């Protein structure tokens, strides 16, 4: 019966999200409410630099690629890896996929390592217990620099400064940007095409871009027309 808690009797004192910035995106959030004791001990408890850690990126091009390769020994995924997924934002994956909360490979799970740092331009379920860095904006399909991150890159996460930075030089940034080619989008339905045209990034709520033009509709433009109204004298026979 004691499900809804008040402020004085909370489940967790410091919970919620952190809003992050970085040198390869303008905005992201981290679900700090689900940081486990295991995760905190492994990544956030360095006495010299608490809440700061550096991991090597392992990059996946969407959920299909993740499921296909996560258990490959060639990736050499270990507890110092950060799993990165892209192509999952509102443009790359209309609706934005709930896929950022990736599990470690089976061999790490068997060792008791139940969570690795993860990062991506998609979403995750509200019930997920993964402390992912998600909603990376702009997404890779919109030209965001998440698209130039490579497997093996070192990524520095500093929760004290609310920053996530890839540790490459400015010249390397420019080189990768100049060589990058964004893959053409594959619209499987007209609704996907429409969504990609009018929906913004997750940092803005993935809302319709022209939404601000349609406030106080009745005052500005009158009551919208009813699509089934013929007048009081008419009745429908079904």
Task: Give residue ranges: language-model regions.
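Catalytic or ion-coupling anion/metal-binding cores of large enzyme and transporter domains
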Residues: 1-139, 144-238
């Amino acid at each position: 019966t004691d499900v809804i808690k008040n402020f004085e009797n909370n489940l967790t004192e410091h919970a919620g999200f952190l809003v992050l910035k970085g040198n390869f995106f303008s905005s992201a959030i981290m679900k700090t409410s689900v940081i486990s004791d295991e995760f905190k001990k492994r990544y956030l408890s360095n006495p010299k630099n608490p809440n700061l850690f550096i991991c090597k990126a392992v990059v996946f091009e969407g959920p299909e690629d993740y499921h296909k390769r996560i258990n490959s020994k060639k990736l050499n995924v270990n507890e110092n890896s950060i799993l990165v997924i892209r192509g999952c934002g509102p443009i790359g994956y209309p609706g934005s996929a709930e896929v950022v909360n990736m599990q470690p490979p089976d061999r790490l799970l068997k060792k008791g390592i139940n969570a690795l740092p993860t990062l991506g331009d998609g979403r995750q379920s509200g019930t997920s217990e993964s402390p992912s860095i998600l909603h990376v904006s702009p997404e890779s399909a919109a030209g965001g620099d998440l698209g130039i991150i490579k497997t093996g890159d070192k990524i520095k996460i500093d929760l004290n400064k609310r920053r996530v930075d890839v540790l490459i030089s400015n010249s390397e940034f420019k080189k990768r940007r100049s060589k990058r080619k964004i893959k053409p989008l594959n619209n499987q339905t007209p609704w996907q095409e429409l969504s990609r045209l009018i929906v913004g990034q997750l940092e803005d709520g993935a809302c319709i871009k022209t939404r601000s033009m349609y406030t106080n509709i009745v005052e500005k433009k009158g009551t919208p027309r009813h699509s089934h109204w013929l007048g009081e004298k008419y009745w429908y026979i079904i």
